[in-house]
């Protein structure tokens, strides 16, 4: 009797398993590079503001705003927004039309369109009473792992003036994004361009972003300590104005009390804070803010009520 050779069935033979790499994500828009850090800082408040929001349908809503301040005359704003049926993400609905008009007749309007699955268009118009101030047209293409944007600002064929801005972002890895911005302006007797390079690194709990070019530098650092505490650090340098600013922001959420606190301290000796409180079960949000500039001896405080 000889040795018995046991052969394993073909189905049980070891196989080499090739791990398929996940595709790189889309880096988003160039304007959103510093958004996480900027959302930590409080918005400037001054005077008394009343905002009443009214949802008329699933597509249309309006808002009435009355603002009274010691720095100027009382003002009224009518804000309208229309959202279409095509929801690309929880925060993106197409088409979208937004308009804001004040008591003097000045208008700010914005139109967002989805021309194709990856191609978006935006038009922005701004008037001061009966005079056009700004008209801007954007085209954005979002690939699998890159975003390219071209913006035309105040194009005037007769006056031969235009502002062109080109953005490009590329995902290098799942955490690293690199890109740049090219700003070109032309008007009679003047022409120039500014190039800015950008980079963004996203970790599990923090995000670091840097823009640097001939016009200056902008760096930000965002850190999420836990579900309640977020901090942000921002540095801006402007070569034309020969000015630098360093800011520290703090964001605290108290879900049990329905309160949100935002504070800031910067290198210009400015200290500010805003406290928001939701008055449940009423659809009312109260906000109280104060800002003090020690260097210029200026103090501003504000109070707002938002209904709806």
UniProtKB/Swiss-Prot annotation:
Protein origin, superkingdom: Eukaryota
Tissue expression: Widely expressed. Higher levels in heart, brain and liver, very low level in testis.
Keywords: Membrane, Mitochondrion, Mitochondrion outer membrane, Protein transport, Transmembrane, Transmembrane beta strand, Transport
A GO CC term attached to the entry: mitochondrial outer membrane translocase complex
Record flagged with keyword Transmembrane: yes
Pfam families in the record: Porin_3
GO BP annotation list: protein import into mitochondrial matrix
Main localization category: mitochondrion
InterPro entries, per the entry: Porin_dom_sf, Porin_Euk/Tom40, Tom40
Molecular-function GO terms, alphabetical: mitochondrion targeting sequence binding; preprotein binding; protein transmembrane transporter activity
Subcellular location: Mitochondrion outer membrane
Required for mitochondrial targeting: region residues: 281-308
Function: Potential channel-forming protein implicated in import of protein precursors into mitochondria.
Protein family (similarity comment): Belongs to the Tom40 family.
Subunit structure: Forms part of the preprotein translocase of the outer mitochondrial membrane (TOM complex) containing TOMM22, TOMM40, TOMM40L and TOMM70. Interacts with mitochondrial targeting sequences.
Protein name: Mitochondrial import receptor subunit TOM40B
Organism name: Rattus norvegicus (Rat)
Record lineage: Eukaryota, Metazoa, Chordata, Craniata, Vertebrata
The gene coding this protein: Tomm40l
